[in-house]
Amino acid sequence: MCGRFTRFTPAADIAKTFSAVTSQVEIQPSYNIAPTRSIYVVKGGVSRAINELHWGLVPAWSKDISRASSMINARVESVREKPSFRNLLASNRCVIPVNGYYEWKQVPVKGKVSAKQPFYFSASVESEYCHDGMLAIAGLWTTWGNGEELYSSCTALTMEATERISIVHHRMPMLLDNQRLDLWLSDDTKIDLDELAIPIDLQIDIHPVSKAVNNARNDDRSLIELIDVEESEPLSLF
């Protein structure tokens, strides 16, 4: 599950990186984006555009928007069967640009009860999945309501984690390189999801960060800085 992420790249730079246009009012950069917050997404096929949506999908058929915080992720394995998502795959695909995301791992600490330690994941500059310092997460979007009461929202697709990422968490966002991104944002209504969601042991930076990120009200650059963690079993890949 991907439950928190960062986005501090300005809208104009996101538009340039993903060959999109934007007329959006700048959303405040954030180092601790939680569910239901407003985020940028890239939509469109040939004519891409940056749009502002709420993170946490509210299906068009919902009675209200109360389910938003529970639908921040959609599993690749079941997205084609779930009523909330299956009809969105053909034409309501989007990309969620993030600078990084957080996951938590139960870590044994010397002399203390084990606790959940947050880790920060970001793109290695050498990686083909790095888009000018950003990761591109495959997403789905929709709009709830009618008339003056409209609520546009999105969800992030998740998949089985690669070997490296699974040391922290068994799931990961469905990340896109340039080729997969172009296919995901294309007008093709019959994309091969299985082909796009193949786990690739991509280059990604992972390091432990402060537990201050646990509180969504904390929001500054210190949240993504590397910290030292005393542990009885070292995390050999970090």
Can you name each region flagged by the protein language model?
Residues 1-238:
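Short linear sequence motif anchored by a di-proline
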